[in-house]
Amino acid sequence: MIAKEFETFLLGQEETFLTPAEHLAVLIDTHNADHATLLLSQMTYTRVPVVTDEKQFVGTIGLRDIMAYQMEHDLSQEIMADTDIVHMTRTDVAVVSPDFTITEVLHKLVDESFLPVVDASGIFQGIITRKSILKAVNALLHDFSKEFEIRCK
């Protein structure tokens, strides 16, 4: 369990580690593979969130998913180019709710580079990246004593 003071400090950094949906490049589940490939090849992220037109979270997709789907189904480039990405989207993705705990985020980010934040209605709210959490932990290590007093028991 994380000490209450540490969790309070880290949650105070939430603005720095929660990237809202409106500031992200996302794909719509009906986009075709050509569109997704173009977007993914121009980004630094290896995966991006996939949502419906109504902002319902579907999953995530990366170039590897697109290539694997094409090879698995032996599809030509022409057919693949027009195929909706919903068929190749990874749906078994770890997510957190907007009322996440730091413990939950830290445990899930061990295996994922980012966590989608999805509300109870399934609406995509944004992401928390491993990099942003590491920056918050760095701030904790450098700035904690400016706000809190550290004493030995």
For each of these PLM feature ranges, what is it?
Residues 1-153:
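Tandem CBS (Cystathionine beta-synthase) repeat/Bateman regulatory domains
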